[in-house]
Swiss-Prot record:
The keyword Zinc-finger does not apply. One of its GO terms (biological process) is chitin biosynthetic process. Keywords: Cell membrane, Cell wall biogenesis/degradation, Glycosyltransferase, Membrane, Transferase, Transmembrane. Polymerizes chitin, a structural polymer of the cell wall and septum, by transferring the sugar moiety of UDP-GlcNAc to the non-reducing end of the growing chitin polymer. GO terms for cellular component: cell septum; plasma membrane. This is Chitin synthase 1. Belongs to the chitin synthase family.
Length: 189
């Protein structure tokens, strides 16, 4: 749950920064309406209960509604949608939610019934959501990866400045707690 929360905090912060770009022709106060955060998770029976609780707190998941079969046919996935204004805080590994005042974020949550791995999740994103949303750019982030406060904006800006770009990747840095881990030579290298 805290890895998921770490990622969502970074994504939410990026959306907030885009909403605060008042002089931008593309972004600004209503920027959140141009961004959809899609979350794809494998296997309903195996999703971390605390992560489910965070998703429920954000309003994009309801426990007990999903069924394995409908009319005798296996269900492939469950899709939930919600625009949340709930914020997330993280202290160490303790996740807490702030019920008011956060920048709105449009969320789509796809919970697959069976484990099909990451590439299948990417296919779900591009083939299912991509066709419906018709996005200008897509940013894929693994749970646990925390995007910098304006890194998604800068990634978008690269595509905006050069429309012939087909793909880009960002830099990943190790999160250190003020150098504490540097005492361990395996971590320091």
């Amino acid at each position: 749950d805290f890895l998921f929360a770490r990622t969502m905090i970074g994504v939410f912060k990026n959306i907030e920064i885009m909403c605060n770009k008042g002089s931008s022709q593309t972004w600004g106060k209503e920027a959140w309406k141009k961004i959809v955060v899609c979350i794809v998770s494998d296997r309903r029976a195996k999703i971390n209960p605390r992560t489910r609780a965070v998703l429920a707190g954000l309003g994009v998941y309801q426990d007990g509604i999903a069924k394995q079969q409908v009319n005798g046919k296996d269900v492939t996935a469950h899709i939930y949608e919600y625009t949340t204004q709930v914020g997330i805080d993280l202290k160490g590994t303790q996740v807490s939610l702030r019920p008011k005042g956060a920048t709105p974020v449009q969320l789509l949550f796809c919970l697959k019934e069976k484990i099909r791995r990451k590439i299948n999740s990417h296919r779900w994103f591009f083939q299912a959501f991509g066709r419906v949303l018709d996005p200008n750019i897509c940013v894929l982030i693994d749970a646990g990866t925390k995007p910098g406060k304006d890194s998604i904006y800068h990634l978008w800006k690269a595509f905006d400045l050069e429309p012939m770009i087909g793909g880009a990747c960002g830099e990943i840095k190790v999160m250190l707690e003020h150098g504490k881990k540097l005492y361990n030579p395996l971590v320091a290298t």
